[in-house]
Amino acid sequence: MMKRFLAFLIGACVVTAVEAQQSFWLGADISGTTELEARGYQLRNAQGEPRENTALMRELGLNAVRLRVWVDPVEHGGFCNRDDIVRMALRAKDWGMALMIDFHYSDWWADPGQQNIPAAWKQMTYEEMKKALAAHTRDVLQAIKQAGVEVKWVQVGNETTNGFLWPVGRAQQHMRQYAGLTDAGYQAVKQIYPNAVVIVHLDGAYDPNRYDFIFDGLRKYHARFDMIGLSIYPYWDMRGKHTQSWQETVEKATANINRLWVKYRKPLMVVETGVESKKPVEGKEILAAVIDAAKNKTNGHCQGVFYWAPEAEHHYPLGAFQGGRPTAIMEAFTEASR
């Protein structure tokens, strides 16, 4: 009996050690993968060998993928609709990568500057919209589940610093309704994936006030969530004169992460970050600093870092590729994965 107990104890320790190694996540939002492929764009590794995007992220040391969902992007090629997401989710599964689903609750981009109601929902009342949001959430997640893919995290909204589904869920005017819509999403997620971690995601990690505004409001109206998601973009913070240097952005974001844990007792995740692609050497330094701060300066409360669209080039200044190949920026992930 004692031998059996000792064997169980040793096995439990091994499992715990493995889980500890995976407790910090290195991820990327590669939602544009199928659109790039449809345009005939070929990605390659640093050696010039052709690679599919998901496989390339795994090769670079990443262990998680984030995929955005649009409600009905028929005017935008149908990319990031339910069926497209299932295709990309299967690739993440094939490469053994954890999956985050990011619901925009819009037919196209949703961010702090625009949170447009999907065309099919525009004439709905608040109560009808709650039901539509929940049904859409269940529909997409059920399709992913039926494909045999586990979902580890689900974002209920994307950068909802000012709420979403404007004007119905605009937080400044209708916090109660924003909270109600958020909780409807939470309940829908748990119906399909009871163990999925539900994230509420805001931008501007340097700024504690915007986080207090949203999360105090959600708490006041009893909206549930499991994790706080943050965006850290030193480039945009400096352009907007919110910070004077990338170091200041990282320092303020780290302080905010630690403060948020104390106040709300929820784990956190950097679900979006990016650095200037034209400066890959400095970019690697910045990304390495973000990863180090999240991993080593938050007492384990920040559980990972996701890069937004590393493969993006041309009109987007914060990708991490040039000529279809990863730059030195991505080495920050590779080195952190060792």
Model-derived regions, located:
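Positively charged n-region of N-terminal signal peptides that target proteins for export
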Residues: M1-F5
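Acidic (Asp/Glu)-rich catalytic clusters
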Residues: Q22, E52-G61, R87-A98, Q142-V149, ...
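N-terminal substrate-binding region of glycoside hydrolase catalytic domains
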Residues: Q22-A98, H104-L133, D139, T243-S245
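Hydrophobic faces of well-ordered beta-strands that scaffold small-molecule active sites
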Residues: L26-A28, V65-L67, L99-F103, K152-V156, ...
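Active-site beta-loop-alpha junctions enriched in small/polar residues
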Residues: S31-T33, W70-D72, H104-W108, V156-T161, ...
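Aromatic-rich peripheral "rim/lid" segments of glycoside hydrolase catalytic domains that contact
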Residues: A38-L43, W109, A255, R259-R265, ...
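Active-site cleft segment of glycoside hydrolase catalytic domains centered on the general acid/base Glu
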Residues: C80-V86, D111-F225, D237-A255, K279-I291, ...
